[in-house]
Amino acid sequence: MKVTFEQLKAAFNRVLISRGVDSETADACAEMFARTTESGVYSHGVNRFPRFIQQLENGDIIPDAQPKRITSLGAIEQWDAQRSIGNLTAKKMMDRAIELAADHGIGLVALRNANHWMRGGSYGWQAAEKGYIGICWTNSIAVMPPWGAKECRIGTNPLIVAIPSTPITMVDMSMSMFSYGMLEVNRLAGRQLPVDGGFDDEGNLTKEPGVIEKNRRILPMGYWKGSGMSIVLDMIATLLSDGASVAEVTEDNSDEYGISQIFIAIEVDKLIDGPTRDAKLQRIMDYVTSAERADENQSIRLPGHEFTTLLAENRRNGITVDDSVWAKIQAL
C-alpha cells in the first residue's frame, strides 16, 4: 500500500503521544521515523517502529531522558545517553561532533548507555550535508555468530561513512551480509536474498531470509573479515565511551539497550579547497562508473547514491508500506 509522508508521521505521532511522550519529543521522533521511511530505508523506519514502541513500553527507552556530557578533551567528548530516545540522541551527538570539528578540524563523541539509533546512515548523511565527512558506528546485543561458531557472540555493529560529494556518497553497512531489518524486508516481500546471507539448520549457506531470522545464524560480511571488524568496532566503542560491550549488553540486560556508539565529523575544507575537493571526488566517481560492465543491464553503483532517487520517487508516488506492518501500527 501507499501512504503519504504526512500520514506516516501522524500515525507515529499518535502512538507516541498515547504512550505518554511529550508533544515536542513525539513530533521530533515521528519526523525522524517518517524521514527514514521516505528515504527508502523501510527496515529501520516504519518496519522498526512497533519494536521501538515495545521497548518504550518495557521501560528500556526513557522518553524524557536527556544525554549528559561526562568528559571533554578538546576534540573528543564522552557522553551518557541515559537511555534516551535513540534516534533523537544520535542526531544531537553528530551535531555535537560537527561543532567540535568546526573548532578543531575533527570532532569525536563517544556515547554510552544509548538506545538503538534506527537508521545509522541518517547521522553520516547529516554531517555530509554540511560539508563534513561523517563516520559513526554502534555496538548491539549479540545477534551474530563469530566466524567458526554456531552461537551468537558478536553484534552486527553497523558502520557508516559518508562523504560530501555531489550527490553524497555513503556506506551504511552492518558487519553481517544483511541486517536483520533487511532480512525482514525480503521475507515480507516473499523474496530470496540476492546472495547467501546465513546458514540453514544443517550448516549450509542459504538465501532464505526466514530461516536465518529464526535460527540467527546470520553470515558475517566477508566471512571472517566481518567477524573481525565487528569485534574491533565493539572494542573501540566500549573503550572510548566507557560503556557496555556486546558481551555486557547481552549478558546483563533483558534486551538491547544501554549500548555504546561513536560519532566522528571531519571538516574537509580545513585540508583542501572546495574546487579541488569537488574535482578529486568527481574523478573518483567517474573512474569507477566508467568501468566495463559485467552486465549491460546493470549499472555500476556508487554507495548511497540510490537514496537521492528513492527519496524523489517516494515524494512523487507515495511511500510503500507493507500491509501487515501498517496494520500493526494502526493497532498500537
Swiss-Prot record:
Catalytic activity: 3-dehydro-L-gulonate + NAD(+) = 2,3-dioxo-L-gulonate + NADH + H(+); 3-dehydro-L-gulonate + NADP(+) = 2,3-dioxo-L-gulonate + NADPH + H(+)
Tagged with keyword Methyltransferase: no
Residues annotated as binding NAD(+): I168, T169, M170, V171, D172, M173, S174, W224, K225, G304, H305, E306
Main enzyme class: oxidoreductase
GO function terms (MF aspect): 3-dehydro-L-gulonate 2-dehydrogenase activity; NAD+ binding
Annotated EC: 1.1.1.130
Pfam families per record: Ldh_2 (PF02615)
Active site: H44
GO CC aspect terms: cytoplasm
Subcellular location as annotated: Cytoplasm
UniProt keyword terms in alphabetical order: Cytoplasm, NAD, Oxidoreductase
InterPro entries listed in its UniProt record: Diketo_gul_Rdtase, Mal/L-sulf/L-lact_DH-like_ah, Mal/L-sulf/L-lact_DH-like_NADP, Mal/L-sulfo/L-lacto_DH-like_sf, Malate/L-lactate_DH-like
Protein's job: Catalyzes the reduction of 2,3-diketo-L-gulonate in the presence of NADH, to form 3-keto-L-gulonate.
HAMAP family cross-referenced by the UniProt entry: Diketo_gul_reduc
Family per similarity comment: Belongs to the LDH2/MDH2 oxidoreductase family. DlgD subfamily.
Assembly and binders: Homodimer.
Protein name: 2,3-diketo-L-gulonate reductase
